[in-house]
């Protein structure tokens, strides 16, 4: 299962929850009628939930679920995580990848030098930035742009980059 949101609080008295989306597709993931799975804090057993309503409010997604109509029924969800099954993922365009496909990949240069493993993806704006942790425990920031990233092989968990001047300084 894959994370699509973290519940940070309740909202109002009618059973809405406040979610920070961890998906690039919140409008699609949180569409009315869709199923998500709640993993409450300190629980390994998921609860299947069907989305009854979705709206944006500031930087949050506000959700309500079928059968849950009051704050007293959703307070327990605080700090929980919403997930979807792998079969619920949508197909991506060419050269688009899910974060979970990229995180854990080994990054090597076109000269064959291994730089480390991608441990995180930042989304600051125009393009994603991959955080690569090397054997020396230092983190390097690699922009996901065509001039740098030359090949992505998610099956082998290997990414080849061309090191531009100043990139690793």
UniProtKB/Swiss-Prot annotation:
Xref: InterPro entries: PRC-brl_dom, PRC_barrel-like_sf, RimM, RimM_N, RimM_N_sf, Transl_B-barrel_sf
UniProt keyword list: Chaperone, Cytoplasm, Ribosome biogenesis, rRNA processing
Purpose of the protein: An accessory protein needed during the final step in the assembly of 30S ribosomal subunit, possibly for assembly of the head region. Essential for efficient processing of 16S rRNA. May be needed both before and after RbfA during the maturation of 16S rRNA. It has affinity for free ribosomal 30S subunits but not for 70S ribosomes.
Subcellular localization, as worded in the UniProt entry: Cytoplasm
Subunit field text: Binds ribosomal protein uS19.
Organism of this sequence: Listeria welshimeri serovar 6b (strain ATCC 35897 / DSM 20650 / CCUG 15529 / CIP 8149 / NCTC 11857 / SLCC 5334 / V8)
Family of the protein in this entry: Belongs to the RimM family.
GO biological process entries: ribosomal small subunit biogenesis; rRNA processing
Domain note: The PRC barrel domain binds ribosomal protein uS19.
Xref: Pfam families: PRC (PF05239), RimM (PF01782)
Domain of life, per lineage: Bacteria
GO terms, molecular function: ribosome binding
Domain spans labelled PRC barrel: 94-167
One GO CC term on file: cytoplasm
Name of this protein: Ribosome maturation factor RimM
Broad class of where this protein is predominantly found: cytoplasm
Record has Membrane as a keyword: no
């Amino acid at each position: 299962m894959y994370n699509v949101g973290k519940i940070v609080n309740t909202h109002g008295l009618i059973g809405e929850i406040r979610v920070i989306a961890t998906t690039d597709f919140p409008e699609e993931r949180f569409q009315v009628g869709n199923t998500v799975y709640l993993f409450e804090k300190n629980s390994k057993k998921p609860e299947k939930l069907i989305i009854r309503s979705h709206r944006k409010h500031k930087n949050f997604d506000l959700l309500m679920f079928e059968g849950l109509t009051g704050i007293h029924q959703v307070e327990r969800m605080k700090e929980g995580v919403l997930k979807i099954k792998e079969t619920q993922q949508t197909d991506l365009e060419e050269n688009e990848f899910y974060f979970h496909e990229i995180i854990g990949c080994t990054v090597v240069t076109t000269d064959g030098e291994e730089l480390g493993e991608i441990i995180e993806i930042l989304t600051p704006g125009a393009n994603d930035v991959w955080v690569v942790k090397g054997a020396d425990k230092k983190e390097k920031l690699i922009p996901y742009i065509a001039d740098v990233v030359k090949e992505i092989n998610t099956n082998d968990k290997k990414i080849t980059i061309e090191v531009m001047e100043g990139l690793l300084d």
